[in-house]
């Protein structure tokens, strides 16, 4: 037998190298084979519920890191809640209708206008389902557990039926109407857009100052005055029908170069500088209210331009007079309604001028800027043309500019229940406080919701028309359509004639002959996803409404958060969520948006292949997701180093509890060694912190707390001296079993705590905890913090001891630098303490030499002031470090004067303590001795 054979060296097959990319797919297969998600749900049957409702990602293309951030975050929450005593089903969803899928078909050579509509819709469906399958596989590879076999898809018949019922309820309450007013129009996709489908990009545009000659000034101004406007959309001048002045502003008539111009008095200096007017003479000042109902002439068409009043006119830029084209601006439209101006919008679906703009027919609207400017110049109405860069709305799908264009559309009126939505916004728990302000302002300021789209792939608007063109939407018709959709899917709308989509025997005064037609437009996809509270939470009996949490990217304040609360308040009077948490965007390591053109994109699959999903998950836990976050392969490499610390700690704990059976070997708390009590109480505090952090969705706090505990409490202190106990002491000694008791509790509960973040690693570790009854760590319960009497005093004492230890370590380091010692085990430490330190050492009642990893620790009877000159002085003690007397023990490596003095020749190389252990545990050595 060798000396090392008398040591309790930790043994484990738990590998130091994780090999996550190779192992994780096997774990995911094991979870699926064991129906782990379902088993956890069964365990929690009858417990309080927690509903995290999944916002549906769009079914198009591989997932990106933003998807990963979102799905991993949700999985962390659901796993935690499930282990914390909640029934927390997680039903993933997909948004499966809309323009991007039509665009993908177009790229593949399938053109909607050249195909049978039903064939085209089937191709859309097949493409969407293929994308769902692909993304589902991607999400599973991240370790996300969910009801993957029963997701919700916005194209499923039962979902479409539920959506129709939401529409029907809103129509029944009078919120749905058809109107013609300016809305965002995308010429590139030939469809209307909602505000949520708009993104802004910087563009270079022309701006012009235009003079409109007066026709009738009501005798209040000279008849030869000209009203000056400024616009950034010259192409809308053909649609001009009026000019707005603010009723409360003063306007000046100025004489310049033989002409008389009207502009806001406060803007005169700025405009004069811009137009290079020299010494403009103010002839007259008049209130804006006096300008109302004056008439000007259109610059190049034979029609009138009405001067009107509007409060929204500002003096931030321009002239204080605003060009009005009711067919191309929302403010223009609403403010001019009281003047009964017609809505002129001479632009077609593709963005080309119609014959309502004579001379411009067939010209693209953007090309109209040049022609209009030329015409104005010829009429001497163009005072200045210049170019500037500004933020302009674009179609978020095609990335092309959009315009405001008045077209017949279906709208959801928000005004009738806007205040109800705002009241609900106030009631919701916004995990990020500014989220409330953001959504509140959006709801407060938004116009009516344009819900119709001129596309094919989507849920049809369940609207019929009578013989006289009157729209027909009744509870009877919408419910009948909902039932048809539930049975056949929405394709039935395109398969059947209108009469075959109506209830049998249906009659309506608008169709005395019983003839009907049907709406051709489909619904905005935001109405699709915005109805998910009904299509999912209300439709599935194991879910409940409202959801406890909606968690999505910060772009969803204008999107899903907004559309969901709008439809839910309209129908139910309440928000569909109790709490909302948003996340920032994922940027590259330099803080730039990820873009294929820059070449800085990181694909989740590349991360999982190189590092493993657990590293990506640990990164998610390590960041503040409330704002934009950065990621790069270098950052992920740093995260993998942190992971290595966690893994090595788990491995050490497994190895050193491998011969520990908690049922037989555990020590009661009261009998634990003082330092072990401290570590158990310290870990109990960690559990308390982590439970609170998980409850608050603060993953970064969970991460930091765990890493801090592993690094500072375990690695730098407890496990640093642990080898002197678990390796050296007798296998079944109280000292060793005391420490193993604490190690086992920490190991077991730390694994449970890690399950939500590192599920693959946690489950791998769990297989080494053979005494735990659950087959999977995920089936265990989350540890709860215990109430331990006297814990505050104990923590206080030990914090003071650790401060004391820092001073000793500083003195040891100084001695090492002075070559007095090599390793700390070569040292004898003598301290000269004040009474406070003496009291502290008495209170902790410990083997201080062992905790400090020195051979001897001596408390001198002398006070601090009597310490030798060579001692390191502190306020409350002096520390003298000397080389320990004696020889090094071949077993524990301590320097001890008893080494070499044992009566038994075979034990002479051991200190007295080790010799006693060997004598007791290995009596054969007394006769046989050790091998060389």
Swiss-Prot record:
GO terms for biological process: isoleucyl-tRNA aminoacylation. L-isoleucyl-5'-AMP binds at residue 552. A motif ('HIGH' region) lies at residues 57-67. InterPro entries: aa-tRNA-synth_I_CS (IPR001412), aa-tRNA-synth_Ia (IPR002300), Anticodon_Ile_BEm (IPR033708), Ile-tRNA-ligase (IPR002301), Ile-tRNA-ligase_type1 (IPR023585), Ile-tRNA_ligase (IPR050081), M/V/L/I-tRNA-synth_anticd-bd (IPR013155), Rossmann-like_a/b/a_fold (IPR014729). ATP binds at residue 596. CDD domains: Anticodon_Ia_Ile_BEm (cd07960), IleRS_core (cd00818). The keyword ATP-binding applies. Keywords: Aminoacyl-tRNA synthetase, ATP-binding, Cytoplasm, Ligase, Metal-binding, Nucleotide-binding, Protein biosynthesis, Zinc. Its EC number is 6.1.1.5. Its cofactor is Zn(2+). One of its GO terms (molecular function) is ATP binding. Binds 1 zinc ion per subunit. One of its GO terms (cellular component) is cytosol. A motif ('KMSKS' region) lies at residues 593-597. Pfam families: Anticodon_1, tRNA-synt_1. It catalyses: tRNA(Ile) + L-isoleucine + ATP = L-isoleucyl-tRNA(Ile) + AMP + diphosphate. Zn(2+) binds at residues 889, 892, 911, 914. Gene3D superfamilies: 1.10.730.20, HUPs, Ile-tRNA synthetase CP2 domain-like, Valyl/Leucyl/Isoleucyl-tRNA synthetase, editing domain. It comes from the Bacteria. Coiled coil: none annotated. The keyword Transferase does not apply. Belongs to the class-I aminoacyl-tRNA synthetase family. IleS type 1 subfamily. IleRS has two distinct active sites: one for aminoacylation and one for editing. The misactivated valine is translocated from the active site to the editing site, which sterically excludes the correctly activated isoleucine. The single editing site contains two valyl binding pockets, one specific for each substrate (Val-AMP or Val-tRNA(Ile)). Monomer. Catalyzes the attachment of isoleucine to tRNA(Ile). As IleRS can inadvertently accommodate and process structurally similar amino acids such as valine, to avoid such errors it has two additional distinct tRNA(Ile)-dependent editing activities. One activity is designated as 'pretransfer' editing and involves the hydrolysis of activated Val-AMP. The other activity is designated 'posttransfer' editing and involves deacylation of mischarged Val-tRNA(Ile). This is Isoleucine--tRNA ligase. It comes from Lactococcus lactis subsp. lactis (strain IL1403) (Streptococcus lactis). The gene is ileS.
């Amino acid at each position: 037998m060798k000396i090392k054979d008398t040591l309790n060296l930790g043994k484990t097959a738990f590998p130091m190298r994780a090999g996550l990319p190779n192992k994780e797919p096997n774990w995911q297969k094991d979870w699926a084979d064991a129906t782990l998600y379902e088993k956890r749900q069964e365990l929690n049957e009858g417990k309080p519920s927690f509903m995290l409702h999944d916002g549906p990602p769009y079914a198009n293309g591989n997932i990106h890191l933003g998807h990963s951030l979102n799905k991993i975050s949700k999985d962390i929450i659901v796993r935690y809640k499930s282990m914390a005593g909640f029934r927390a089903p997680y039903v993933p969803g997909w948004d499966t209708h809309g323009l991007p899928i039509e665009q993908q078909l177009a790229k593949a050579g399938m053109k909607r206008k050249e195909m049978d509509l039903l064939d085209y819709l089937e191709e859309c469906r097949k493409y969407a389902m293929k994308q769902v399958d692909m993304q589902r596989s991607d999400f599973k590879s991240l370790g996300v557990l969910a009801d993957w076999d029963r997701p919700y898809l916005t194209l499923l018949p039962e979902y479409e039926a539920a959506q129709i019922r939401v529409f029907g309820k809103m129509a029944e309450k009078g919120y749905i109407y058809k109107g013609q007013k300016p809305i965002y129009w995308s010429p590139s996709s030939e469809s209307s857009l909602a505000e949520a489908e708009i993104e802004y990009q910087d563009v270079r545009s022309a701006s012009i100052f235009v003079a409109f000659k007066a026709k009738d000034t009501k005798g209040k101004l000279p008849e030869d005055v000209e009203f000056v406007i400024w616009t950034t959309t010259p192409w809308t001048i053909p649609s001009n029908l009026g000019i707005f002045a603010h009723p409360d502003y003063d306007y000046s008539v100025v004489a310049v170069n033989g002409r008389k111009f009207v502009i806001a008095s406060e803007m005169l200096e700025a405009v004069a500088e811009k137009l290079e007017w020299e010494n403009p003479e103010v002839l007259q000042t008049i209130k804006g209210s006096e300008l109302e109902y004056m008439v000007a002439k259109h610059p190049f068409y034979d029609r009138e331009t009405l001067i009107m009043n509007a409060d929204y006119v500002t003096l931030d830029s321009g002239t204080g007079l605003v060009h009005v084209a009711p067919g191309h601006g929302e403010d223009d439209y609403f403010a001019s309604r009281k003047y009964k101006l017609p809505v002129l919008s001479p632009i077609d679906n593709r963005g080309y001028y119609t014959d309502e703009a004579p001379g411009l027919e067939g010209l693209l609207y953007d090309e109209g800027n040049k022609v209009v400017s030329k015409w104005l110049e010829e009429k001497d109405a163009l005072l200045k043309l210049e170019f500037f860069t500004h933020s302009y709305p674009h179609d978020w799908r095609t990335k092309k500019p959009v315009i405001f264009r008045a077209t017949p559309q279906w709208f959801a009126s928000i005004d009738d229940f806007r205040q109800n939505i705002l009241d609900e916004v106030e009631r919701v728990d916004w995990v990020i406080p500014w989220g409330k302000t953001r959504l509140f302002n959006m709801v407060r300021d938004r116009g009516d919701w344009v819900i119709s789209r001129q596309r094919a792939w989507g849920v049809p608007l369940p609207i019929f028309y009578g013989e006289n063109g009157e729209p027909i939407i009744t509870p009877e018709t919408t419910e009948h359509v909902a039932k048809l959709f539930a049975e056949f899917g929405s394709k039935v709308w395109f398969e059947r004639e209108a009469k075959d989509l109506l209830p049998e025997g249906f009659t309506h005064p608008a169709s005395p002959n019983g003839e009907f037609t049907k709406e051709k437009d489909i619904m905005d996809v935001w109405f699709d996803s915005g109805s998910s509270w009904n299509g999912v939470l209300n439709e599935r009996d194991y879910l409940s409404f409202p959801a406890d949490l909606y968690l999505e990217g910060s772009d969803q304040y204008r999107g899903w958060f907004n559309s969901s609360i709008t439809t839910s308040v309209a129908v139910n009077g309440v928000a569909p969520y109790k709490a909302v948490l948003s996340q920032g965007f994922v940027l590259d390591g330099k803080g730039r948006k990820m873009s294929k053109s820059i070449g800085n994109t990181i694909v989740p699959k590349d991360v999982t292949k190189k590092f493993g999903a657990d590293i990506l998950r640990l990164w998610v836990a390590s960041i503040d997701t409330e704002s934009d976050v950065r990621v790069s392969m270098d950052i992920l490499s740093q995260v993998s180093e942190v992971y290595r610390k966690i893994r090595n700690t788990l491995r050490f704990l497994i190895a050193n509890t491998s011969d520990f059976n908690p049922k037989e070997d555990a020590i009661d708390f009261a009998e634990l060694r003082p330092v072990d009590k401290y570590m158990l109480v310290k870990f109990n505090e960690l559990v308390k912190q982590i439970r609170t952090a998980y409850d608050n969705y603060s993953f970064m706090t969970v991460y930091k707390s765990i890493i801090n505990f592993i690094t500072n409490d375990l690695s730098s202190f407890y496990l640093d001296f642990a080898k002197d106990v678990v390796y050296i002491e007798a296998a079944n000694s109280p000292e060793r079993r005391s420490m193993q008791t604490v190690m086992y509790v920490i190991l077991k509960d730390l694994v449970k705590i890690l399950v939500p973040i590192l599920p693959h690693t946690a489950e791998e570790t769990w297989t080494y905890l053979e005494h735990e009854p659950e087959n999977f760590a995920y089936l265990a319960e989350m540890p709860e913090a215990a109430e331990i009497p006297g814990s505050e005093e104990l923590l206080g004492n030990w914090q003071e001891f650790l401060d004391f230890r820092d001073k000793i370590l500083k003195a040891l380091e100084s001695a090492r630098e002075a070559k007095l010692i090599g390793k700390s085990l070569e040292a004898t430490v003598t301290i000269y303490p004040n009474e406070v330190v003496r009291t502290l050492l008495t209170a902790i009642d410990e083997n201080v030499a062992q905790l400090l990893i020195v051979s001897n620790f001596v408390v001198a009877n002398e006070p601090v002031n009597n310490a030798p000159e060579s001692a390191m002085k502190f306020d409350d003690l002096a520390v003298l470090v000397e080389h320990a007397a004696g020889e090094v023990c071949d077993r524990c490596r301590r320097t001890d004067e008893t080494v070499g003095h044992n009566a038994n020749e075979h034990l002479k190389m051991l200190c007295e303590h080790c010799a006693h252990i060997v004598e007791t545990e290995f009596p054969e050595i007394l006769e046989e001795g050790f091998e060389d």
